[in-house]
Amino acid sequence: MKKIGVILARLQPIHNGHLALIKKASEENEEVHVFIGSADKFNERNPIPINMRHDMAMAAIVERGIKNVSIHWLDDLDDESNNSHDWGFYLYSKVVSEIQQSNFTIYYSDGFEIITSWFPGFILRNNVSLSLLARGAVED
């Protein structure tokens, strides 16, 4: 089984915090999969279209020489404020469908309570692990 890191971010726009997470995940995994959330949204909260977010992310990743990263688009389940188990199952199924593996590590910078609310305990115990990069640990 491959060691796979997963990052979920809207990238509105991509910034040093996102890149630090991607770099950390790249150093610790064989593959990193970045899922750009709210891919189906183009509004005041999501003013940058998904194709631009994708292109900016790829350019920043390549510019920094970060390897083994794939980028995927992820539509919202319904409302981006949905932090239910429905969202967790939706996210988990989308990730597993893309990476073809049921075990992975989610890299995040805040919101532990939110992330853990997405998944029933059995998924966190058996399939998904979490890795924190505190916002204060990010260099400008």
Question: What is each model feature region?
Answer:
Residues M1-D140:
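Nucleotidyltransferase catalytic core that binds NTPs
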